Design a protein with these regions (language model features):
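Residue-level signal for inorganic ion chemistry
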Residues: 24, 78, 112, 197
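Short, solvent-exposed cationic patches
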Residues: 215-226
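His/Asp/Glu-enriched, well-ordered alpha-helical/loop segment
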Residues: 42-48, 74-75, 81-161
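Predominant activation on well-ordered alpha-helical scaffold segments within soluble catalytic domains
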Residues: 8-12, 61-64, 109-114, 132, ...
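Histidine/acidic residue-rich metal-binding segments in metalloenzymes
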Residues: 1-75, 83, 91
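C-terminal cap of metal-dependent C-N hydrolases
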Residues: 89-94, 100, 150-216
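A short acidic, glycine-rich active-site loop
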Residues: 47-58, 98-103, 179-185
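Conserved active-site and cofactor/substrate-binding residues in soluble primary-metabolism enzymes
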Residues: 2-6, 58-62, 100-108, 122, ...
Length: 226
């Protein structure tokens, strides 16, 4: 989970030498910072205790540039949720007892579309690459996953680029009582999600059934290394 320009420069240096160096970052490092999201009242700062920690805001533009230049290939989430009540609050009086991690899996694509493509930081194709194609290649799942092609699984998202909403713990579907991105206004959201040709999300409602997942045998190495 690359979070700083210092680490980004090391990755760029290795890639410039022709080494097979790959890296990813997470939405919290692209949208949150020490400057804007720390020093909150009470124990609120515990909501953004994770590893690596937040950095100064100036690192964000460097990370966006790394995504654009392909120094960074993927944006993941480091989704490791704990509720604020009764879990994060275990660290009141002792920082070392704060559970390390935060929720984020639900809003990865929306944040990157709204803050990346819509604001001109990355192209539409690049958004798809860092969210879908590159992860499939890295993990040895391409071309079964990560592309809409003959012979590939029909994993398809129909995207509404004009859908506007505000991220909130009151409306998200994650089983946690807070959001790291509470109050952030977003433009763009999934209208329909299909998995292997079956509609599992429609108009913000989930229709998937427990047990429908299938084992997928991966290649021994991803196509990114070839």
């Amino acid at each position: 989970h690359l979070s700083s320009n210092d680490a980004l420069e090391k990755v760029a240096e290795a890639r410039d030498k022709g080494l097979p160096a790959y890296a990813e970052t997470c939405p919290q490092y692209l949208f949150l910072s020490i400057d804007d999201d720390m020093n909150k009242p009470g124990f609120e700062d515990a909501k953004v205790v994770f590893t690596p920690p937040l950095r100064e805001k100036w690192h964000q533009n460097k990370l966006w540039a790394g995504l654009k230049k392909n120094t960074l290939q993927i944006v993941s989430t480091d989704h490791c949720p704990f509720c604020f009540k009764e879990q994060k609050e275990l660290g009141i009086g002792d920082f070392t007892k704060i559970p390390n991690g935060g929720p984020g899996i639900e809003h990865r694509m929306q944040l990157l579309f709204s803050g990346g493509f819509s604001e001109g930081r990355i192209t539409l194709n690049r958004w798809i690459e860092i969210c879908c194609t590159n992860p499939a290649k890295m993990f040895g799942l391409y071309p079964r996953k990560g592309t809409i092609s003959i012979g590939s699984d029909a994993d398809i998202v129909i995207w509404d680029p004009n859908k506007e909403y505000t991220i909130s713990a009151h409306t998200h579907h994650m089983c946690t009582d807070y959001s790291m991105f509470e109050g952030k206004k977003i433009k763009g959201n999934a209208e329909t999600v299909m998995s292997r040709g079956e509609v599992i999300v429609k108009d913000n409602k989930f229709f998937g059934k427990p047990g429908r997942g299938k084992f997928i045998k991966r290649d021994s190495y991803g196509t990114a290394w070839q």
